[in-house]
């Protein structure tokens, strides 16, 4: 309840899911880098066999158009252009028989390539 208007407050669902496994791995990588100011930037760019591909990098700066998500002490940054392609996506980290990697499950992708690193909408 909003104390001022006495109306129910509806919380907006997070625009993406950043799993505990992904946050834990990012935290581990940041600790290895020795720079607690680092944040994980996830982005979409043109390329790959399906038209778009995902990218991951560390960044110290939060840009004006970034959406910031906090999870387990880790900040995830997504720029406004990439945001539109990632709404509803799950960003996870898998370590299995196929290897260790960050994985994005994206409901907006209409097709993906065989390796899963590029997609189209």
Curated annotation (Swiss-Prot):
Question: GO molecular function: any one?
Answer: iron ion binding
Task: Please list the GO biological process terms of this entry.
Answer: iron-sulfur cluster assembly
**Taxonomically, which superkingdom?**
Bacteria
For this UniProt record, give its keywords in alphabetical order, as a comma-separated list: Iron, Iron-sulfur, Metal-binding
Q: Which Pfam families match?
A: Fe-S_biosyn (PF01521)
Query: Which cofactor is recorded for it?
Result: iron-sulfur cluster
- Where is iron-sulfur cluster annotated to bind? 49, 113, 115
For this chain's record, the cofactor binding note is:
Binds 1 iron-sulfur cluster per subunit.
**Covalent S-S links between cysteines:** none
Q: Which PANTHER family match?
A: IRON-SULFUR CLUSTER ASSEMBLY 2 HOMOLOG, MITOCHONDRIAL
Role description: Required for insertion of 4Fe-4S clusters.
Q: What family does this chain come from, according to its entry?
A: Belongs to the HesB/IscA family.
Q: How does it assemble?
A: Homodimer.
Q: What is this protein called?
A: Putative iron-sulfur cluster insertion protein ErpA
Print the organism lineage: Bacteria, Pseudomonadati, Pseudomonadota, Betaproteobacteria, Burkholderiales
């Amino acid at each position: 309840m909003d104390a001022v208007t006495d109306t129910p407050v509806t919380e907006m669902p997070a625009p993406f899911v950043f799993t505990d496994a992904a946050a834990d791995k990012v935290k581990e990588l940041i600790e290895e880098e020795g720079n607690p100011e680092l944040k994980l930037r996830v982005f979409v760019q043109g390329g790959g066999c399906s038209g778009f591909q995902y990218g991951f990098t560390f960044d110290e700066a939060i840009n004006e158009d970034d959406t910031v998500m906090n999870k387990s002490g880790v900040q995830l940054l997504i720029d406004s252009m990439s945001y539109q392609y990632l709404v509803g996506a799950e960003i996870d980290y898998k370590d299995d028989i196929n290897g260790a990697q960050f994985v994005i499950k994206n409901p907006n992708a209409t097709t993906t390539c065989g390796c899963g690193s590029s997609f189209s909408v």
